[in-house]
Amino acid sequence: MSYQVSVAVVGATGYVGVELVRLLLFHPMVKIKYLCATQSIGSLLSSHYDHVLKDSIPVSISCFSSIDLSKVDVIFLCLPHGQSNEIVKKIHNEVKIIIDLSADFRIKDIDTYKEWYGAHCCPDLIQDFVYGLTEIYWEEIKKSRFVACPGCYATSALVPLFPLLRLRLVKSQNIIVDAKSGVSGAGRSVDQKKLFCEIHDVIKSYNISKHRHIPEIEQELCFAACQENINVQFVPNLIPVKRGMLSSIYLELEEGVSPIDIREALLVFYKDSKFIFIDEEKAITTKSVIGTNYCYIGVFPGRIPNTVIIVCNIDNLLKGASGQAVQNFNIMMSCDETTALLNIPYL
């Protein structure tokens, strides 16, 4: 790690963007060259966030169109869906590595993408992006120039589900995912639905069976099970906390499989993981993961015969977004996977 790579963060003023910048500041391999946004050009990040000290990030906000791509090795795109693909179309031949945190390159089937997100300006580039679920696609990520980081809900569902379907331990029908997310998952834009009086002391379900992470989850489960047309009952819920995500997953066991077998399979599958752990006590609370890149999975027998309940928690802004992006960056750079990701979080 004797050299540094020049990095640009596009969308640096959003929650995901500022978390990414915070992590990269502690990365010995990174030199932050550009921070880009669409507003407040020329300002410092400290003018957007009170907890950011003025001298800690001396790089001022730039307009993306004004940056010199020849001075950039890696670009992180922390943009709303539908904006990253326009940038990628212009720069994919000019930048060594692109790590996209939007949904623009997650969905491999263009018709499915259009159904959920609308038109895509460079569908021919979708297959060039590796789906950045780190522990599943580690080898592919290492060899790739382009990575599409998973959504937060998708991460919390797929980390436990992918190995279980691949190993044929649970049925691919009747999968139910009930997920709760902190409000930061809805982004930083001004919206009446996110005002304090609208969310305080309130739990709200939204986009039931219509959330855009559904096709992403179903796509990866089809890949895992080597079959087509796996559908998931997915209910996202907004809870009145800043950050954190907890997913409760309800599954039917294959014949002869017990919850003990499920737990053992997950232990073996993730035995070498630096961030994913099987721990029932820590899995049931977001307190275990806030401010970290960790993911805890708990396995519990269902009251209904031949069923199992799995609980999975992550920090939606870290393992669900910026943390996983840095983890993927580390793999692509052939440096220690945990670099810049082991800082002790606040109490």
UniProtKB/Swiss-Prot annotation:
EC numbers on record: 1.2.1.38
Entry annotation: catalytic residues: C152
Matches recorded under Pfam families: Semialdhyde_dh, Semialdhyde_dhC_1
Superkingdom of this protein's organism: Bacteria
Pathway the protein takes part in: Amino-acid biosynthesis; L-arginine biosynthesis; N(2)-acetyl-L-ornithine from L-glutamate: step 3/4
A single GO molecular function term of this UniProt record: NAD binding
Main location: cytoplasm
A Gene Ontology biological process term: L-arginine biosynthetic process
Name of this protein: N-acetyl-gamma-glutamyl-phosphate reductase
Taxonomic source organism: Ehrlichia ruminantium (strain Gardel)
